[in-house]
Amino acid sequence: MLKDQNLDIERKQDHIEINLTKNVESTLKSGFESIHFIHNALPEINYDSVNTTTTFLGKSLQAPILISSMTGGTTRARDINYRLAQVAQKAGIAMGLGSMRVLLTEPDTIKTFAVRHIAPDIPLLANIGAVQLNYGVTPKECQYLVDAIKADALILHLNVLQELTQPEGNRNWEKLLPKIREVVHYLSIPVIVKEVGYGLSKKVAESLIEAGVKVLDIAGSGGTSWSQVEAYRATNSLQNRIASSFINWGIPTLDSLKMVREVSKDIPIITSGGLKSGIDGAKAIRIGANIFGLAGQFLKAADTSESLLFEEIQLIIEQLKITMLCTGSRTLKDLAKAEIRL
């Protein structure tokens, strides 16, 4: 057990370092580069009246942005999460925590995840890999993770390709959907199911919605490739070659968004995976997202300073607002109907 705990910590340290220092981008594009807004040269809107506010999980957001799940469990991760939480609270946006599995075996790591005292007002998302339900994690333990950080929802992330390219990864993905359904019905708060960079298909979305999942984070291809991250962690040539061969795997984010929105007009969708700017976020809103998530550039900024992170988030928000005004969109509902060309 101690060996497994140490491996969890070591893996989290590796993931931070690799994401900060290596090129781990998918060779696929997110797809949003193919969408272009029709410029409105006469919007008849005062910039000060452009309204980016929305609600998510019953809480108000100043902008439809999620700091996507990244890290936890280590001292460096604690510092990053504290900065992320401070700035998320200041900016009025949502935040997801990294995988909290380690907390089930290492209670002392709670200090690297517990940020509610820093961010009392924002939507805060707990997180664990869905496959852990096949390896002994129970609905009661999922509720424990939620309670430990006073979360507004629990993310169950689907990372099958990442697990299969880890030498220590979990291989048993059989009969997982019934266990997800069990967690959905056990928890006192909503369950979000999230991919990690390879997209949700129409068929998977249908199954998850039928199981009672309340929010989907499509996390398509076009951003971080976790198989490429694992390629850098590989300890031998074979492991490296296996992981590297999936650099262009997955459903591009735009395609996944369209598929999932076709399944349901009502389910809240978080769109993430390869979004680089508020302009990309605006495109996601236009195609059917409720909020959009980013991680990579926030991680790099948060590892440096709170001020740099706040500047990065302000950049995203300003890009979004300018896009809204230049499309004649006073609100996010207006943006969802803005003219585009493909």
Curated annotation (Swiss-Prot):
Record's keyword annotation contains Magnesium: yes
Keywords: Cytoplasm, Flavoprotein, FMN, Isomerase, Isoprene biosynthesis, Magnesium, Metal-binding, NADP
Record GO terms (molecular function): FMN binding; isopentenyl-diphosphate delta-isomerase activity; magnesium ion binding; NADPH binding; oxidoreductase activity
Cellular component GO terms held in the UniProt record: cytoplasm
Gene3D superfamilies: Aldolase class I (3.20.20.70)
Self-association and partners: Homooctamer. Dimer of tetramers.
Family, as annotated: Belongs to the IPP isomerase type 2 family.
Protein name, as recorded: Isopentenyl-diphosphate delta-isomerase
Provenance organism: Rickettsia peacockii (strain Rustic)
